[in-house]
């Protein structure tokens, strides 16, 4: 049986546009922390690749997977599968996943100490709309998302994660990088102490 005691999932959460995917990419490129690939029924954005950015599903194929968590967001389904988690842990002991706050709570409940929550926020909400528009989302989709109850929910750190999540305000990318560097360093030290 494989020793799972050292394995950790960095659960990156926050409202859409706070930089969750950018943070996940930074962790991968600077620390070789692979991202758990999740499933969605939303259409691909320009440049996205099936099996790399998401597993792009249809309404018919989505329910055929085994999910640790899944959610409907802005009329599309999103979910992370047990198989995706296992595939990521085959690559590394420290992996990341991008989730909404509801999914982050589920991971924290289901995985306990193996789930390390990172909550991203910004100082001004108009930054979020600008980021959504600049990444190629259609204006109608952006407006739909920022009016959704899920978006409003994800702007705030859930009470269930208070005291458990590390909060990073992602207004200035250089400051965010420094905060992420300190976060990963502390996490690796913690993993090494479990190992010894």
Feature map (PLM): residue ranges:
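Hydrophobic anchor at the beta1->P-loop junction of P-loop NTPases
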Residues: 12
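P-loop (Walker A) phosphate-binding loop of NTP-binding proteins
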Residues: 15
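ATP-binding Walker
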Residues: 18
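Walker A/P-loop
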Residues: 21
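Post-Walker A helix-loop "phosphate-sensing" segment adjacent to the P-loop in P-loop NTPases
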Residues: 29-37
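ATP-dependent small-molecule kinase phosphotransfer cores
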Residues: 40-95, 99
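Conserved phosphate-donor/acceptor-positioning beta-strand/loop module used by diverse small-molecule
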Residues: 96-100, 111-134
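Small-molecule kinase domains that catalyze NTP-dependent phosphoryl transfer to phosphate-bearing small molecules
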Residues: 137-184, 194-196
